[in-house]
């Protein structure tokens, strides 16, 4: 094993640079959160063309004494790739377009959720959690589970639902175009944990003869209104799931332990007809091996797996781990359909 003394100066400098990049990367995200709170992406969009610094500063809700500091914030955000700068004017990059508040496909709420103090504090408590018997670092930080916290904080619940809805917009676009065949022949579908119905609305629109039901906790669907072939039903997936030809679980199971996943899947199995009548469960989840095969350069399932541990004491799963869950829940047939990088559509049959 090499030691610091045996390493060359060049190697040590590269190591120091690597650590500096990692340590200071949080500043990019804190600066991005600031930009969203100030409305910088939307200000540029509303302007209709690239904005110079004076125009941008005048459009922002800031104290006049802070105007001289905006150029330093923008320099950081340009380097991070969220904005472009040319001839002293700032514009949105393709990445920045995903930050617009009123665009149906956006990750603005997801960014604000991930940088919310409620989600940052458990990471600070991570080492403490390893030394105690709390279920999760989230419990160590807040004294309650993620779901208890969410149910007691309406504003946080709203942000969480908005973040999930933004994610669903992109997934729904892919589903109803490239994977339309998954829903063909179905007469009824229940979207379990479907929140405000973003995904189910897209499916209902693409398939007018398919009766779609969003099934979620009362606080998630209380203010939602059905329309045409879409309705909302309140309930708990651990108690029962409404009957349908197919049950949809979009990024639900990775939030739960193996034991709870089996409970959810068993309830789904009770609610669909047999394989000979076309009954199935449609799962959208990450599969660890697919990410390795894709060679994705971006932060992926290893990051998400850590977040699942920190928030829920759950995890991302391999094909082998998924297969065991399906078997334990009583499903005899399943197939993995690669969709987006490490994300898969998994079809289960009784």
Curated annotation (Swiss-Prot):
Expressed in roots. The active site is at residue 254. S-adenosyl-L-methionine binds at residues 193, 216, 236-237, 250. Keywords: Alkaloid metabolism, Cytoplasm, Methyltransferase, S-adenosyl-L-methionine, Transferase. InterPro entries: COMT-like, O_MeTrfase_dom, Plant_O-MeTrfase_dimerisation, SAM-dependent_MTases_sf, WH-like_DNA-bd_sf, WH_DNA-bd_sf. GO terms for cellular component: cytosol. Optimum temperature is 45 degrees Celsius with N-deacetylisoipecoside as substrate. GO terms for molecular function: O-methyltransferase activity; protein dimerization activity. Gene3D superfamilies: Vaccinia Virus protein VP39 (3.40.50.150), Winged helix-like DNA-binding domain superfamily/Winged helix DNA-binding domain (1.10.10.10). GO terms for biological process: isoquinoline alkaloid biosynthetic process; methylation. Optimum pH is 7 with N-deacetylisoipecoside as substrate. The keyword Transferase applies. It is found in: Cytoplasm, Cytosol. It holds the Pfam family Dimerisation. It catalyses: 7'-O-demethylcephaeline + S-adenosyl-L-methionine = cephaeline + S-adenosyl-L-homocysteine + H(+); deacetylisoipecoside + S-adenosyl-L-methionine = 6-O-methyldeacetylisoipecoside + S-adenosyl-L-homocysteine + H(+); deacetylisoipecoside + S-adenosyl-L-methionine = 7-O-methyldeacetylisoipecoside + S-adenosyl-L-homocysteine + H(+); norcoclaurine + S-adenosyl-L-methionine = coclaurine + S-adenosyl-L-homocysteine + H(+). PROSITE patterns: SAM_OMT_II. Coiled coil: none annotated. Its EC number is 2.1.1.395, 2.1.1.128, 2.1.1.-. The keyword S-adenosyl-L-methionine applies. Pathway: Alkaloid biosynthesis. It comes from the Eukaryota. Belongs to the class I-like SAM-binding methyltransferase superfamily. Cation-independent O-methyltransferase family. O-methyltransferase involved in the biosynthesis of ipecac and benzylisoquinoline monoterpenoid-isoquinoline alkaloids natural products, starting by the condensation of dopamine and secologanin, and including emetine and cephaeline, drugs used both as anti-protozoal (e.g. treatment of ameobiasis) and as emetic agents. Mediates the 7'-O-methylation of 7'-O-demethylcephaeline to produce cephaeline. This is 7'-O-demethylcephaeline 7'-O-methyltransferase IpeOMT2. It comes from Carapichea ipecacuanha.
């Amino acid at each position: 094993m090499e030691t610091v003394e045996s390493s060359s100066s060049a190697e040590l400098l590269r190591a120091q640079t690597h650590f500096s990049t990692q340590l200071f990367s949080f500043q990019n995200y804190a600066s991005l959160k600031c930009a969203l709170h100030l409305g910088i992406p939307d200000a540029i969009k509303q302007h209709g063309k690239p904005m110079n610094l004076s125009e941008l500063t005048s459009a922002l809700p800031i104290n006049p004494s802070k105007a001289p500091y905006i150029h330093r914030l923008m320099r950081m955000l340009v380097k991070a790739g969220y904005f472009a700068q040319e001839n002293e004017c700032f514009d949105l990059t393709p990445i920045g377009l995903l930050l617009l508040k009123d665009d149906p496909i956006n990750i603005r709420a997801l960014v604000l959720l991930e940088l919310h103090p409620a989600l940052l504090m458990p990471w600070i408590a991570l080492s403490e959690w390893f030394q105690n018997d709390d279920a999760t670092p989230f419990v160590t930080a807040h004294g309650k589970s993620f779901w208890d916290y969410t149910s007691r904080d309406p504003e946080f619940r709203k942000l969480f639902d908005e973040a999930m809805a933004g994610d669903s917009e992109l997934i729904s676009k892919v589903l109803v175009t490239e994977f339309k065949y998954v829903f063909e022949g179905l007469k009824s579908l229940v979207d379990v944990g479907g929140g405000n119905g973003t995904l189910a609305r897209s499916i209902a629109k693409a398939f007018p003869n398919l009766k779609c039901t969003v099934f979620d906790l009362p606080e998630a669907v209380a203010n939602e209104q059905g329309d045409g072939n879409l309705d909302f039903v309140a309930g708990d997936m651990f108690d029962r799931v409404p009957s349908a030809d197919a049950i949809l679980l979009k990024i639900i199971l990775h939030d739960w332990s193996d034991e709870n996943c089996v409970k959810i899947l068993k309830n789904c199995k009770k609610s669909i007809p047999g394989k000979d009548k076309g009954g199935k469960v449609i799962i959208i989840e990450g599969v660890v091996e697919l990410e390795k095969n894709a060679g994705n350069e971006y932060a992926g399932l290893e990051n998400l797996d850590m977040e699942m541990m920190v928030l829920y004491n759950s995890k991302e799963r391999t094909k082998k781990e998924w297969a065991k869950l399906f078997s334990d829940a009583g499903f005899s047939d399943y197939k993995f359909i690669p969709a987006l990088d490490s994300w898969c559509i998994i079809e289960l049959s009784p």
